[in-house]
Amino acid sequence: MEQIAARVTYINLSPDELIQHAVKNGEGVLSSTGALAVTTGKRTGRSPKDRFIVKDEQTADQVAWGNINQPVEQRTFDQLWERALRYLSERAVYISHLQVGADDNYFLPLKVVTEFAWHNLFACDLFIRPSGDHANGKPSWVILSAPGLKTDPERDGVNSDGAVMINLSQRRVLLVGMPYAGEIKKAMFSVLNYLLPPHDVLPMHCAANAGQSGDVALFFGLSGTGKTTLSADPHRFLIGDDEHGWSATSVFNFEGGCYAKCIDLSQEREPMIWNAIRHGAIMENVVLDENGVPDYADARLTQNSRAAYPREYIPLRVENNRGRPPDAVLFLTCDLDGVLPPVALLTKEQAAYYFLSGYTALVGSTEVGSVKGVTSTFSTCFGAPFFPRPPTVYAELLMKRIEATGCQVYLVNTGWTGGAYGKGGERFSIPTTRAIVNAVLSGKLKEGPTEVLSGFNLTIPKSALGVDDHLLNPRKTWEDVSAYDVRAQRLIQKFRENFEKFKVPAAIREAGPSDVH
């Protein structure tokens, strides 16, 4: 394993010790909740333009290179890695031995080396703490995080003063000039998303929970569309809130913690998340008042304020961090146009179509430099920034899993209805969406009467327990039906234009929307 030279090395400190170091180092302060509060300067979200993957013989033909998966030469990586090692050699560093993947067959051992104590705490909160020597002879991946080291675009061959570089062949992840902790977890997510498909495991940007009888539900969606909120269900057991694998025999969490958005967090609406923000947790870019009390409504630092906490802080959880193959799969889409239904039942071909499309919204975007407010987007696999291989690799695996299990896939709109965003529409309330989810998970939704929504050709229920019937057909929620048709046709055209880039069987392409009539 790679040796790290440093002025002082702290290895496998406890969360309490890491918190003490972070406060002593001036990295953060303790809030009234007991959680460690930190700020990350100008980088309050991910920096997709600064993420690179080393292009070599192993990866050249396997990665979908482009604006998302930007190639970097091995030599460029090596030079920056050495610069980071020299930088860290003059400082105190924190090292923890962790793992990603809660499945004995597919986990990866990790050696996390950080300049900041709080980044190491973040890794301990979000990754899995192994019991004993659990590496089983597997070689460790090394994460090197040096947020205080700035890059020079001309000298270092990068785009700004920071970079994330993933070296899939050498099992190394390098983060320099990146104080935002989300980069650490998403880098390893990208690694697993590359490594697992050849092993017949579908990696997924989704939350997962289980019912009393062990039935499993998956919630796919971009940040801010409801994954964490809806999976933290007071009547179900959490597996995880963000990253999972689906093998032939199980669903398993990649992580050992949660990373919840905090903007406008309320104890009433999201009690499980609220109660998890305590000693041992981290609040990232949450504004505190003079008494250290968090103001979750204050977005002056960012809309993307966050809390990181271990899974153990959620009382209702699946202890072994995994479950059986899913009984229900929910694609959470946040529709700004207000033309999609609150819920629709998808065929497996429609599931592949909407999975590849990934239509949703960027809500309080997690990316640096994004426009404030809400914008619609198509994000392949409901997580385009994290999937290195061609999208059809993941879509084919999804269809294979659906065919093998017979699980029902649903499209759930957590966005607007009765009109478009900012033009008279209203967002579905969390209680309404929870009622939809409850109807899905009860199994009764797919047994009741349905109708087909024109244009989108989606099968929608005529009734759902706890939901007003008139909300189920979006066309009926608009006062001006012709205005609905115009808006729906506009979105259908966007779907078609976006889907042109995919080379897929005709059955999948034809499962998409047609003209409104």
From Swiss-Prot:
Binding site for Mn(2+): 186, 205, 242
Binding-site residues, substrate: 46, 180, 186, 306
Keyword annotations from UniProtKB, A to Z: ATP-binding, Cytoplasm, Decarboxylase, Gluconeogenesis, Lyase, Manganese, Metal-binding, Nucleotide-binding
Coiled coil (residue ranges): none
A GO term, aspect molecular function: metal ion binding
Cofactor(s) this protein requires: Mn(2+)
Main location as per UniProt: cytoplasm
Catalytic activity field: oxaloacetate + ATP = phosphoenolpyruvate + ADP + CO2
Gene Ontology terms: biological process: gluconeogenesis
Similarity-based family: Belongs to the phosphoenolpyruvate carboxykinase (ATP) family.
Stated name of the protein: Phosphoenolpyruvate carboxykinase (ATP)
Biological source species: Coxiella burnetii (strain CbuG_Q212)
